[in-house]
Amino acid sequence: MGYDDGAGDFTFAASLDKAVEIGMMTRASADCILQKQYALYRRDLVDLSVSALTTPLADGSATLAESLAKKGVFTWEEGRAQGLIGGGQESYVHSSLRNTGAPKPEQSASSGAVSRVTKTYALPSGSVSADVITVDTSAPGVSVRAAMVNQKLGASAPFSSIVSASGADVIVNANFFAAYSGQDKFPVGHVMADGTFLYGVSGLTSFGFTGSGAVYVGRPAVFFYIRGGRNSWACYEMNSKTQGSDLSVVYTPAFGGSVPIKIDGTATTVAGGVITDVRAVAAGETVAIPANGYVMVFGSDFTSTTWYREPSVGTSVTLTPGLTDSDTSGFPMEEITAMVSGGPRLVENGAICTTLEPGFQEARFTSAVTSRTALGKLADGKLVIVSTGSASIQQLRELMLQLGCVEAVNLDGGGSTALAYQGKLIRSPGRELTTTLQIFTH
């Protein structure tokens, strides 16, 4: 990939720049390789290739070696034998500056950490055939990640493409989204990936996962707090298209390059952690979203409250998610690294839950029999993933309870129902997907 000497085709640094450009590694990974100053033999092709092969791809989904093994360039066994997969991996993974819980040893998952059972279950309301995957999320080497296509709201991709690019042992569809023709494909409920919220609208049951493997279930009432100097501002939602005179919403690059303004109010722009612009806006305007920042949109009634303080240009600020004072979910927001949401809730505190949240009272959530996906939590903390080609919500409730779940929620289903296990498509959806939950054991 290049040499440092004068006779080389191009420099070592230039070759790393090219690797970043084509998505072989992140900029941070390339800089890390340079800073480590490996004792390479003239930094030649073989040595650099080993470093590159064991470095995660730009999207963080897998290492280059794992991706190549997935595509059949060489086998997993050959990769492990050469130290390219498993214990030989260098960790150059970007993470947000937050406490993600006690780290787990980086090693291959023990046998039994992930298991799959396919069978027909006899239930009070009728038999259901399902794939049931149980995951010991606290086992060494196991990690749970939520993923959104291109980390952008509204982006979608065929499930087969998501599976091919991931390298995860288990992939399942997650949040409901506006899926039909002409709709924006935005998700429903919270979505957090790699410790960063991509979408935040409270009200639905969410599954949250920490870096140490703990699983939390509840309806976290999340605010997004921007703090600077002696002042602070609370945004009720993140990247929501809903705007109101009494609301406050924060927009990040996951929303897009700009945000259309629908109400009269104030827009505050933050770039690089510093407030760069504060101005009055009116419905019909558009405000650019910085690639390294975000925009806060406050409605006119919100800014008229006695406790609102006008932001000042030049103020250094931080953005952190937190729970409202009235929240009872108990989510440790400083430790959560992944979150997906769904509805209706199926099991709560070890008992069947028949309450239907707003938006989940149509026939497809009550009497209809269709393909479904569900997440559950066992009493010992393990995660249960269920995928079935035919079940009613009541049957799904009964199944999750029979499996021993103390908490469970229904995820998107119907034409979105998707499951991949160890690289094989077990259940293919009838449409492109936006958000998935992925389990890694290496």
Describe these PLM feature segments.
Residues 98-442:
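Gly/Ser/Thr/Pro-rich low-complexity, intrinsically disordered segments
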Residues 1-100:
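N-terminal propeptides
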